[in-house]
Amino acid sequence: RVGRDGQPAGCAYPTTKFAVNGLTLSLARELAGKGIRVNAVAPGVTHTDMVDALPDEVIKPLIATIPLGRMGEPEDIANGVVFLASDMASYISGVVLPIDGLART
């Protein structure tokens, strides 16, 4: 969501998300004629060592904002990447795939 709507404080984070969106679409258009697809993933809160180090008072409110009711697992992100790299996605290019439990961070 921040990469689409921005946020009022701290412009660096949404700026990098906007950059990934723009770069993905621009490269996809630039390379389409060569048969090269360009896509990206936008992972939400994912169960990692970094997240495990956060206190419960930080994690619980984050999970409460995720409509699917849980944080992602690394395998969730990997599955999206494998799909985008597969022949099943051969007609998909210029997409930033949110893998975020509908949180749209």
Predicted regions mapped to residue ranges:
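Active-site "substrate specificity/gating" loop of NAD(P)-dependent dehydrogenases
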Residues: 1-10, 32
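Alpha-helical segment proximal to the catalytic Tyr-Lys
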Residues: 29-33, 90
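Short, flexible catalytic-loop segment of classical short-chain dehydrogenase/reductase
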Residues: 4, 38, 42-53
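Short C-terminal tail/terminal secondary-structure segment
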Residues: 4-5, 82, 93-105
